[in-house]
């Protein structure tokens, strides 16, 4: 009997610990919505690794985006395209967080995409027959539906 109560207490405490407050949910949604414009913007920039000029445009976009967020960026030159190091120091550092971001993509065959262009982020929802139907991208700014998907080249990497 003691084991049952112990297990019940553990399960209940885990469930309570995982629940987000309404305030946290509001903050998360606010920042998610604010990020949709940036996501759409970077997905519109071709990033085929075989074209250094495309990668340069992506690096420039990242430099600007990081600078807006208080990061200092530094290019690390390589024999091909530069790497970008972005750093933001905390006032009272406790731990270091390292995030790896990949901005180059593989070549894409545009004829195999079921939309205008792989470089045009397109919001879709799944129909009852399993196909994906285009919906207005601006709907993301009004409401977030976790069943919607953004289709564009490199979306899963961004």
Residue spans of the language-model regions?
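Acidic/His- and Gly-rich active-site-bordering loop/insert found
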Residues: 18-157
């Amino acid at each position: 009997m003691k084991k049952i109560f112990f297990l019940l207490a553990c399960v209940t405490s885990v469930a309570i610990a995982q629940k987000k407050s309404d305030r946290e949910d509001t903050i998360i949604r606010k920042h998610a919505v604010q990020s949709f414009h940036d996501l759409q913007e970077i997905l519109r920039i071709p990033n085929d690794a075989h074209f250094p000029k495309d990668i340069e445009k992506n690096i420039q976009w990242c430099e600007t985006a990081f600078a807006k967020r208080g990061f200092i960026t530094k290019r690390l030159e390589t024999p091909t395209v530069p790497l970008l190091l972005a750093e933001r120091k905390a006032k009272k550092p406790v731990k270091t967080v390292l995030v790896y971001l990949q901005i180059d993509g593989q070549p894409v065959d545009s004829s195999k995409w079921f939309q205008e262009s792989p470089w045009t982020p397109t919001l879709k929802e799944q129909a009852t027959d399993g196909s994906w139907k285009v919906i207005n991208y601006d709907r993301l700014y009004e409401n977030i539906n976790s069943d919607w998907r953004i289709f564009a080249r490199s979306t899963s990497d961004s």
